[in-house]
Amino acid sequence: MSTLILVRRQLLRELDAFIREVEACPDDEVLWKVAPGVTNSVGNLGLHVAGNLQHFVGHMIGGSGYVRDREREFNQRSGSRAEVCAALRAARDVVDTTLAGLPEERLNGHLTGVLPDRALPIDAFLVHLGAHLAFHLGQAGYLRRVLTGDNTSQSPLPIIAMLETA
């Protein structure tokens, strides 16, 4: 199985789990709360990963023209679970479409404009984006549990889900 297929499946799996985390918030108010010592709410984390993937996968790799508002991702303090889920679903659609149409050999190419002084290998950058998404998914899950007292996991499916035919 190709690296591209595995990375695509991982990103989609983590985004699906993030949507479940947002939906598991009992109300829209919890979505924007933080615990002491925590800077970002579940809502901010959701908007951030959605914007991050729309920008880097959709725009930088796929040429979508998406214009990112990173400041809004971290400064928004209200909104509905449905709105955050819609942003995550839109990012999921972009990831799915962009990576499904990406030729495998493009993974060996480089991406410019991410860092000011160097080009990044696309395959390595996609792995980084998966780790970044998983990191924030873990933060969102832990924060939701702390704020609600609900210890129910919304985590991604086991690795076998990445190996099965989509």
Q: Which role does the model predict for each range below?
A:
Residues 21-22, 95:
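Short amphipathic alpha-helix starts
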Residues 1-8:
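N-terminal leader segment of winged-helix/HTH proteins
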Residues 76-113, 120-134:
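Acidic/histidine-rich alpha-helical segments that form the ligand environment
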Residues 1, 35-46, 78-93:
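Short secondary-structure boundary segments
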Residues 8-12, 16, 22, 29-72, ...:
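Short, contiguous alpha-helical
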Residues 26-28, 70, 103, 107:
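Glycine-rich, flexible loop/turn motifs
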